[in-house]
Swiss-Prot record:
One of its GO terms (molecular function) is lyase activity. Pfam families: Nitro_FeMo-Co, Radical_SAM. InterPro entries: Aldolase_TIM, Di-Nase_FeMo-co_biosynth, DiNase_FeMo-co_biosyn_sf, MoaA_NifB_PqqE_Fe-S-bd_CS, Nase_CF_NifB, NifB_C, rSAM. Pathway: Cofactor biosynthesis; Fe-Mo cofactor biosynthesis. Keywords: 4Fe-4S, Iron, Iron-sulfur, Lyase, Metal-binding, Nitrogen fixation, S-adenosyl-L-methionine. The gene is nifB. It comes from Rhodobacter capsulatus. [4Fe-4S] cluster 2 binds at residues 265, 268. The lineage of its organism: Bacteria, Pseudomonadati, Pseudomonadota, Alphaproteobacteria, Rhodobacterales. This is FeMo cofactor biosynthesis protein NifB. [4Fe-4S] cluster 1 binds at residues 34, 38, 41.
Length: 452
């Protein structure tokens, strides 16, 4: 990656898998108006117990949003990115989006600005985005064929009128491509989000991937459809299922030769706060933040200095571990899938019983690569575990050889072992990549001894 691009993404948790171990994002819900209807969307406001795009607990004015961002920046030194992702469309509800960015950057000039849009209104604001120093934009692109699009979007609102069917999807497609081209031409990094909808666009997403790569998209994030009936979406109410983990992985792997894939997405709420995989939004509702917070940059500056040192230390440790692995293991050695429990920082630093997700890595003699994450209910409740919860954790770890944890009790360790999953706390609080490589060398050495 060239230095200019790395400078843009190194602190952005969504645009860099490495950065998401260290840095947090914050979404503010200032843009409720939307100009399209998606069959997978129902923008429920006032809902604090769901974790999916478009959901918020409270809608904010730009002034309230700025107040909240300053309060979070003072309490969450990891904060590096302010994003506007709805609950409607940030480019359509443009005046609120623009005013929010203006108010926040007047107080916190170094915060990265990011927005997410369906793309329909984006071409109208390209030059303003440059003027505002927005250098990350996400466009949701689910199709490049209007016939496919008509199955996803019932209507759009464009040029002061509602348009339906294939014609609506044709206009949406043209505007999305114009937005993508215009953003790339202006040096703004574009992440494309695509929702994988089995039987509708699953095969088509390979074409989408090729096209957005050809036009210069920086990342392509293929996400599973969320379609539980209780969410009240058209797809949920009509029985359209989401993809299985295997189906999602198959499409991602089929697209691996196209645009760079983002695999660490958590499908955040439109008011999410914190590291990816956690949401501290309920700690910062309006009734809990000060009326007139004053921004103090000291904690964020100190944290960035610490992260810089940690990154160098982690990089050196990973390089040494990789060299040892290449020396000890044949290039043809088989791959392993290894899960880890982490609270961030790129370390194995979470108790097994507290984990609500597992980060899964693929390792072989050539190195360690992030593969995907698996969510689950945490095993420990009120200080103890439950058998049904362990069963769900085991299901989430299907296909995983080993899980590396900071700590684990005897009961869950034995339960995992009975399911063919080894739990290890030998590398508690170590960096993830060197620990996985150490495990890999150990396994390959054992295998060589058995076959010798």
């Amino acid at each position: 990656m060239d230095p200019a691009t790395w400078a843009k993404v190194k602190d952005h948790p969504c645009y860099s898998e490495e950065a998401h171990h260290h840095f947090a994002r914050m979404h503010v819900s200032v843009a409720p108006a939307c100009n399209i209807q998606c069959n997978y969307c129902n923008r429920k406001y006032d809902c604090s117990n769901e974790s999916r795009p478009g959901v918020v607990s409270e809608r904010l004015t730009p002034e309230e949003a700025a107040r909240k961002v300053i309060a979070v920046a003072n309490e969450v030194p990891q904060l590096s990115v302010l994003g506007i992702a709805g609950p409607g469309d940030s480019a359509y509800d443009w005046l609120k989006t623009k005013e929010t960015f203006r108010l926040v950057t007047a107080q916190i000039p170094d915060i990265k600005l990011c927005l997410s849009s369906n793309g329909l209104a984006l071409p109208d604001h390209l030059d303003e985005l440059v003027e505002m120093n927005v250098d990350h934009v996400t466009i949701t692109i689910n199709m490049i064929d209007p016939e496919v699009g008509a199955k996803i979007y019932p209507w759009i609102f464009y040029n002061r009128k509602r348009i339906y069917g294939v014609e609506a999807s044709r206009i949406l497609h043209e505007r999305q491509m114009a937005a993508l081209d215009g953003l790339v031409a202006r040096g703004i990094l574009v992440k494309v989000n695509s929702v994988l909808i089995p039987g509708i666009n699953d095969a088509h997403l390979l074409e989408v991937n090729r096209e957005v790569k050809r036009r210069g998209a920086f990342l392509h994030n293929i996400m599973p459809l969320i379609s539980a009936p209780e969410h009240g979406t058209h797809f949920g109410l009509t029985g359209q299922r989401g993809p299985t983990a295997a189906e999602l992985l198959a499409v991602q792997e089929a697209c691996a030769g196209g645009a760079n894939l983002m695999k660490h997405c958590r499908q955040c709420r439109a008011d999410a706060v914190g590291l990816l995989g956690e949401d501290r939004g309920q700690e910062f509702t309006l009734d809990l933040v000060p009326e007139a917070p004053v921004y103090d940059p000291a904690a964020r500056e100190t944290y960035r200095d610490w992260v810089g040192a940690e990154r160098e230390d982690r990089r050196a440790a990973a390089e040494a571990a990789q060299a040892a692995t290449e020396a000890a293991c044949a290039a043809s050695s088989p791959k392993l899938l290894v899960a880890v429990t982490t609270q961030g920082g790129g370390r194995i630093n979470q108790h097994f019983g507290h984990a609500t997700e597992f980060q899964v890595f693929e390792v072989d003699a050539t190195g360690v690569r992030f593969a995907f994450h698996r969510r689950c209910d945490n095993y420990c409740v009120d200080g103890g575990g439950a058998e049904d919860r362990l069963d769900r954790v085991i299901a989430a770890l299907d296909g995983i050889d080993t899980v590396l944890v900071a700590k684990i009790g005897d009961c869950p360790r034995e339960g995992l072992a009975s399911a063919g999953i080894t739990a290890r706390d030998s590398w508690a609080h170590d960096y993830i990549e060197p620990a996985i490589l150490a495990l890999y060398r150990e396994r390959m050495t054992q295998k060589q001894a058995i076959t010798a």
